[in-house]
Amino acid sequence: MCGHGDNPACATAIDPKVAAEHGPALAVAGDKFGQGITLAESISIDTLLANPDAYVGKRVRIEGQVDDVCRMRGCWFNLKGDKPGQTMKFKVTDGEMTFPVSAVGKWAVAEGQVRKMPLTLEQTVKVKQHEALEQGQPFDPASVKEPMTIVRLDGLGAVIRDKK
């Protein structure tokens, strides 16, 4: 996964039933990835993050400006939420879809299964270390003091376009 060893945040886990429950792809303008977009309505990233347990395991559609893209494999992108500093990661299995770094600053409509991953302290260190490596930033494992919980969208389809 990701070519990143045993980083727990690199694997996706989409329920086959959730992956199968969709209609035809909608005509959403932009570059299509994976299944494209099949749900007509988006929920806000703010709404999802305010109560992630209500959405865990469900197929949802979100939208936002692409804030960052995996520079190593193109296997994820982050979408900006409604609040400053708020983002939601859209992660796919390596090779299923590859997102270009040029997507940063563009608008994305993304669809997938909401996943919540409570991590141990050791797993949190691995995730933070991997993120620092991807960003070319220094990392001190001692800086991680408590475990984190990741809430993200394991991706089924996306459309990326220049603007909203």
What are these regions (language model features)?
Residues M1-K164:
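OB-fold and OB-like single-stranded nucleic-acid-recognition modules
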